[in-house]
Amino acid sequence: MEINSFLSRHVGPRPEEVQKMLKTIGVSSLDSLIEQTIPSEILLKKPLSVGKAMSEYDYLNHIRELARKNKSYKTYIGMGYYNTIMPSVIQRNILENPGWYTAYTPYQAEISQGRLEALLNFQTLIAEMTKMPLANASLLDEATAAAEAMIMFFNGRSREMQKNSANQFLVSEDIFPQTLEVIKTRAEVLNIEVVVGNHEKFEFTPMVFGAMIQYPNQWGEVKDYSQFVEKAKANRSMILVAADLMSLALLTPPGEWGADCVVGSSQRFGLPIGFGGPTAGFFACKEDFKRLMPGRIIGVTIDAQGKRALRMALQTREQHIKREKATSNICTASALMAIMSGMYAVYHGQKGIATIANRIHQLTNILNEEIQKLGYKQFNKYFFDTLCMQSPVKTDVIQKIALENEINFRYICEDCFAISIDETTSIEDINAILNVLAKAVNKTFKNLDKSAIGTTLTIPQNLQRKSSYLSQAVFNTYHSETEMMRYLKKLEIKDLSLNRAMIPLGSCTMKLNAATELYPVSWPEFSTIHPFAPQDQVPAYLQIIHE
């Protein structure tokens, strides 16, 4: 037996145990078992072409060599994906801990209290940041969440709208393009007409059941949507807002200016970009939609001894109960990512989140001031972290110099581009950006130091957040690594995971991902790659996808 092969380490039964099991059920071999259980018309006649098996050691050498092909440049593309700083205590104790990553969907509350509390933290985070009364425990990503919200609005139309066959969903042309594509795909099969355009010129007719806007929009501009919301409400149309979660530490939350549903991604809360995933989409809405909303909802109850306990609430929406009539499928919840995002908020607390958001905004302010001195025109009157610019020279000139300095911007057209700042950006990074932009227009730039970072918000008063958030005890207790580590362990031991026992439920998710397979996930050659990076920077990802 090859002791280091994946097969011998990853598949539990030994050869003699396999033979004993086969004898018990009356078949001579695994091939015979497959032939008897798989219909002949769908059974492959030849083995899959998957190449020669590797040992775990050989695989790690192979994947390391492959990873080196990717180019991990400093990326300021934005578009819903931003570099973050994952706290080491979360990486070590959740992401790389089988006590968290092997646990099964918490149908059985009595062996899931740890994860249920972690997911409740996530729900609380989302409800607090958006100021919506109800949030679920995550979806796949922002685009999926937006499409689910559209469908929820469609199913929740008033009787009058249903009678009139209202089927139009208005979508601002300023939402992220990947979100729009998913919305169009999901709308097609439901005969929903997606109308894309300038939200300020939308006509709310009796056929319009809902509308969607982005906050801040895909170009980075922070807009006042109050008049738009008034028009929609007058027509009894429902409002969907796709919001940047980190920006809501500084901006007035959508729940305070009329949103019926708020969606987005929690990726900014400590999750790596990872070429676009996995992330955890969030979904928050008014209580009117609680029986129509998708995703798991964690609720507080009491156990048989009268003590506080947690369970999944409103499960009658789910596929395991309603089957084909279900309004929710919780399989695509990205629960581990939601847990990590929630714990990012627990670890930093309100003060930490506010500090991170403010620092991002202040660095963007510096960039905004300096680029205009170099002759670039900046379009966004108000912004959080993204600037959209018109260049005095063609963007291919800027791109050439930027690539020489291993920097990626978002190039929109031949003379327009955008830059998004994130949690990992430093004043040194701002200097590097400005030196690229100065060189492109044949000017010089004198480097700035940390004293240039200001404290003033360049956001109008009516768009600044006034309400408090994350005041709950859980977000104001575990701010040292020791406290956080103990809290995570306390939750972990309340659960039953594959590192302790077999889980008494069967599912497609019951397969253990080997440590060797998961090990490269956090390598920067994979974790820091933007999904819209140039293709010549991601050959390793493209090879993996092709294979």
What label would you give each PLM region?
Residues 105-109, 131-137, 165-170, 210-214, ...:
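Glycine- and acidic
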Residues 1-13, 17-21:
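Charged, compositionally biased N-terminal leader segments and the immediate start
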Residues 84-99, 104-209, 511-547:
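PLP-dependent aspartate aminotransferase-fold enzymes
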Residues 13, 38-121, 321, 461-546:
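N-terminal entrance/gating region of PLP-dependent enzymes' catalytic architecture
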Residues 200-201, 308, 444-468:
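Long, charged amphipathic helices and adjacent flexible linkers at domain junctions
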Residues 351-454, 485, 491-493, 503-505:
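Conserved C-terminal alpha-helix-loop-beta "cap" of PLP-dependent enzymes
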Residues 144-309, 371, 375, 384, ...:
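Conserved PLP-enzyme active-site core in the AAT-like
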Residues 269-370, 374, 379-381:
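Active-site C-terminal subdomain of aminotransferase-like
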